Structure formats: structure tokens, C-alpha cells
Amino acid sequence: MSTITLLCIALAGVIMLLLLVIKAKVQPFVALLLVSLLVALAAGIPAGEVGKVMIAGMGGVLGSVTIIIGLGAMLGRMIEHSGGAESLANYFSRKLGDKRTIAALTLAAFFLGIPVFFDVGFIILAPIIYGFAKVAKISPLKFGLPVAGIMLTVHVAVPPHPGPVAAAGLLHADIGWLTIIGIAISIPVGVVGYFAAKIINKRQYAMSVEVLEQMQLAPASEEGATKLSDKINPPGVALVTSLIVIPIAIIMAGTVSATLMPPSHPLLGTLQLIGSPMVALMIALVLAFWLLALRRGWSLQHTSDIMGSALPTAAVVILVTGAGGVFGKVLVESGVGKALANMLQMIDLPLLPAAFIISLALRASQGSATVAILTTGGLLSEAVMGLNPIQCVLVTLAACFGGLGASHINDSGFWIVTKYLGLSVADGLKTWTVLTTILGFTGFLITWCVWAVI
């Protein structure tokens, strides 16, 4: 099948999905599965393989995020119901003021994003975003948008995240220099993202009922309702902070051990297990069960109800995220990304813009930032021969920032951010998609300026 035909099929699929969700008000989970099925058949994937491809897409995403979203949601619900999120928000609001609090939380997200994967870190910070927004009496989008933006920037540009690490190997870039330059460029990108988010947030966006319940601006279900006694004596700032920092520190320890310890070290496997996001969040949840619930006089039944009340909202996020993975997998298997990349490679572009444009096109066409970065690295692996070490790093970063832009409905991260921030699909495209594209272009332009200097 020709490249043009594949691109038309992919474009028609995206348009159909937008019409189903925005105009026809079809549930995103159902719409994503339906469009994925139709695109798979139209793109020529054998009928007997379509089901396997869709299941692989669902499993590939849910295998990594289901447990994390579930545990993170329960931990966040316990912190929120105890009054801990508001306690933390009140403390920092008194110390910094509302405007500085947004900047401070964004800065914290930058450091959190270096060792922790984007989806894990954002899920951990979600209850804090709700708490700060509630205290400031503003939309959680004002906190969540710059926080998510800087975390995704670090995720695509800075080792030890998989995209930049794998691309460095393909493009012969030194990991040390990639880390240093990646962090250095991510800082001004984050600053631009912070102010871009402020401009985007000048408009008011409607929040979903689930997020309104989290903010206690809509009646919650009986199971998830907060008893007044739970918040009369909220936990202190130190306790709440520790419950957030502990899983992050454990994950960091696992990441550092994998980087510094030899593969044969007897403790490496144990440290990697403990440092996995799943185990780290389980440890934090057990601590919250003891410190926020049992020690504060909550009954076992009440504690169980609170933890259980987090799961319906988490289930929606999980299902829609998984369906987004299905759509992305179908687009990958259809060959649309590869065909597009090969077509762009035949156009005589300078090396740095080629790395960015190919990666951005792959990101927009099939959804996964990591796949976009890796594919670009593979396509350009021979083109970087003869470059000096810093130039190899800059080509790698150009590909990474291409993978940052254009996060939309075929990206599972789009659904995580929009669902947690209570955005509709249309508003998600106006906010999150616009912000990631601004961040991607900003990162590339700074990288190009550095290239010109050296």
C-alpha cells in the first residue's frame, strides 16, 4: 500500500475519532476501539491478526500503567480524604502565595521527572495538584498543565528515560553529555512552558464530574464521601510530604543502582525490585494505611471504603489509556509511521531539522514518543558518522524534542493528563496538545542555536 494511502487512512481515522467523541458524544473508550478496528482493516492488516494487534496494544500499555494508576489513585484518595493535600497546599500558599506555588510545584516536578517516568510522577502528584487548586480556588489545570509539561520534557530529553538512552546508543551520543546538555536545555524549555501554560489558562475550561468530585465542587458518592471528622485534625506537612517523597526516593534508588552497580552484584536484583514503581507505591500505600488511617482512628471498613472509592475513577483512566494504546499500536502495525519516515528521509533536509521533523511526524502519526525517538535514531544512525561527540548529542536531542510535540488522541499520555485534569477531548487538544507542541519546538530551536554556536 502506498505511503499516501496509508497517511490518508491514518488521517481519516483521527478525524473519525474526533467526530465520534466531540460531536457524537461517544465514550472515548468505545470510540477508540471502533476506530482502531476500522483503521486496522482499511490499512490491510490481515483480519485474523487484527484482534491480536488490538489486544497487544491494550496489554502493552496496561501492563505498565494499570497497577501504578490503581495504587496511585488509592494513595492520593487517602491523602485527600485525610485533609493532607489541603494541609500541604495551605502551608505552601502561606509561605509562597498562590502564584509562586504554581512555579514551586513546577520546579519540584522538574526534579521529580528526572528519575521517575512521566505517568508515574504525574499520578503521584495528582492529589497534590487537586489540593493546591482547591485551596487557591482555581482550576487544577493551572497547576497540572505546567507540571505535566515539564515532566514530559524531562522524560523525552534526559537519561535514564528509555527514549533518550536508546537513541543515544543508536546515534553514538555520550550518555553523560546527553544528560548534562539535556538538563541544561530542558530548563529554559520548562520556563517557556510555564508561561505558555499561563497564557493557555487565561481561558476557562469545563471540568469533568469526576474531577469536580475530587475538588468537592460536586456531590461525591456515598462510598467516597469524606467524613467531617477525617479533616478536623489533618496530618502535618512533614507526614504528607514524606508519603509523597518516599516512593519517589525508592524509585530513584532503584534507578541509581541500575546505573552504578555492575550486573553481577548480588543486591542489584533486590534493589531493582524494591525500586520498581509498583513496589514503591505499595510501600507508600501501606505507610498511608498505618499513618493516615489506623493511627488516626479510622475503622478498617471506613479505610477500605475510602481506598475503594478511588477505583471507579481510576478504572476510567485505565480503560481509556489502554484504548489509546490500541489505536497507537494499530497505527504502528499499519506501517504508516515507517512509510512517513522513509518519505521524509528522501527529502534533502539538513541533519538537525531532519531529526526533529521525522520524530515529530512519527509522534503525530503513531502516538508513542519513545517509538518516534527510537525510529528516528535508527533511520539516522549512519548519517551521524563523522560528527563530533557534542554534535551527536544535539542530533539525539533534536529527535527527542520531536517526540515531545503533538501529543494527541493516539497517545496514551494524552488520556492520562486529560482525564486527571478533567478535560474534554476538545479542550485537551486546545491545551495539552498545544503546550506539548510549543515545548517540542522550543527545545528544538534551542538545540539548533547550540548547534550553530559549536
UniProtKB/Swiss-Prot annotation:
Residues 23-27, 74-108, 159-174, 257-273, 327-341, 405-433 are cytoplasmic. The chain crosses the membrane at residues 2-22, 28-48, 53-73, 109-129, 138-158, 175-195, 236-256, 274-294, 306-326, 342-362, 384-404, 434-454. It is found in: Cell inner membrane. The keyword Membrane applies. InterPro entries: Glcn_transporter. One of its GO terms (molecular function) is gluconate transmembrane transporter activity. GO terms for cellular component: plasma membrane. Keywords: Cell inner membrane, Cell membrane, Membrane, Transmembrane, Transmembrane helix, Transport. Residues 1, 49-52, 130-137, 196-235, 295-305, 363-383 are periplasmic. It is a multi-pass membrane protein. NCBIfam families: gntP (TIGR00791), PRK09821.1 (NF007332). Belongs to the GntP permease family. PANTHER family: GNT FAMILY GLUCONATE TRANSPORTER (PTHR30354), INNER MEMBRANE PERMEASE YGBN (PTHR30354:SF25). This is Inner membrane permease YgbN. It comes from Escherichia coli (strain K12).
